[in-house]
Amino acid sequence: MHRHSVLRLARQAGGLPLVELPPPYLAPSLHFSLIRSPVQSSNFSSTTPVAGHGRDLSKSRGVSAIHRTGPKFKLGVSKYPLPKPVSPEALEKRNPTPDHGLWGFFPKDRQALSTPEYDHAHGRSWSIQELREKSWEDLHALWWVCVKERNRIATSNLERERLKAGYGEYESSERDRVIRVTQNGIKHVLRERWYAWEDAQKLYKDGYRPQDEE
């Protein structure tokens, strides 16, 4: 199709949309003249007033994880300088405390992982009848001995799992079971004493006096 024919057809139809115009290889001059503006919108110049880009509002300009480029200015993580590591030779020597209370959470050999022989060497649990004869101070002390021993067993179990030792699990679980039986007995005795105190308080409010029976 000739260019003049396309222009005449477009003027008669009041202007055809781009989808109805012929393809570029049939009318290249017409196609490019309709798409591109014949007038240049801005003057090209390499001088400083015209070629300046102005203020860059993008804060991430120049940051690329692929090319390992960072921002244009330094970023501080803190207003205080980072501490410098000290060599082990410059550190002050500390003498260990042989009788420190935290050693009670470890076996006698002071190792994080107890041996199966150590966990297996234990006695039976306290019976309820034996605990009934104990005072409040004795029960309180025995309870915290059980708590500390169970803490030590839990530490050994965690270390055994971390090292994947593959032994000592049965002995430690059996020792922990015996300790839990003792703790349940202590709670049972304290519960009995609480009920006895409530009953005695109720009888006293009702007017009962033991000396009146004599």
UniProtKB/Swiss-Prot annotation:
The keyword Transit peptide applies. Coiled coil: none annotated. InterPro entries: MRP-L47_sf, Ribosomal_uL29_mit. It is found in: Mitochondrion. Keywords: Mitochondrion, Ribonucleoprotein, Ribosomal protein, Transit peptide. GO terms for biological process: mitochondrial translation. One of its GO terms (cellular component) is mitochondrial large ribosomal subunit. One of its GO terms (molecular function) is structural constituent of ribosome. Its main location: mitochondrion. Belongs to the universal ribosomal protein uL29 family. Component of the mitochondrial large ribosomal subunit. Mature mitochondrial ribosomes consist of a small (37S) and a large (54S) subunit. The 37S subunit contains at least 33 different proteins and 1 molecule of RNA (15S). The 54S subunit contains at least 45 different proteins and 1 molecule of RNA (21S). This is Large ribosomal subunit protein uL29m. It comes from Aspergillus terreus (strain NIH 2624 / FGSC A1156). The lineage of its organism: Eukaryota, Fungi, Dikarya, Ascomycota, Pezizomycotina. The gene is mrpl4.
